[in-house]
Amino acid sequence: MISKEKKNTLHIASCSFGKDSLATILLALEHGEPLDEAVYCEVMFDKRTSGEVPEHRAFIYETALPRLERLGIPVRVLRSDKTYLNLFAGTVTRGPKKGLRRGFPLCGHCYVQRDCKLRPIRRYNRTLTPDTVQYVGIASDEPVRLRHLQGDQVSLLEKYHYTEEDAKQLCQTAGLLSPVYAFTDRGGCWFCPNAKRKELRHLYDHHPELWARMLELQAMPGKVSEKFNRTERFSDIDAAFRKEDALCSKAA
């Protein structure tokens, strides 16, 4: 249930439906912390296809979101009018790369995060009163991230001394742990240039239709860069996985 202690101050929880943000909500409920709503921003690959790994998106909409609403926590879903695909295909309008397609976002300078996630969140934040309290999912064993909290941001995981592993166990016990933790320790879009090898291998093995979309983008001419991440083209990763499969088949 939503706490009635809030009076005139709004309390919201930033929620990716990962272990830390869901554990934050569970702690708020357990300890009677004021909480008015959870806010989730969904990045889209195109107008119909989510940027969430399919298993995580199914978990969000089929398990976690309905569960939170049954517990009395309304969930506000934000989306940008821009998608990964139309940003990728967009044309650079100035500078030495003028006329080229933007192509794959750069690690550390992700235009997708900026335009598809941060801007909708900031637009929503501008509608809030200055005294709004935002709960963020940063664990007690993340000191660097905790030091960067703004004045209106609160970590309930720090307050109640929950580490990342504690948060994971809390979600597991509550039946609210995303299945993506079976193959990754981080959240992120399935097209993220920071994706680890294990995450990419999961996409290759289990979602060939999405993998094929990325190969189509790799083949698109006139991009700023051919690199998917700092060192490789997406087609290089595809070739490496095909080689691994061939070696496994030969060994068998």
Task: Label every PLM stretch briefly.
Residues 1-252:
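Nucleotide-activated chemistry modules centered on ATP-dependent adenylation/adenylyltransferase
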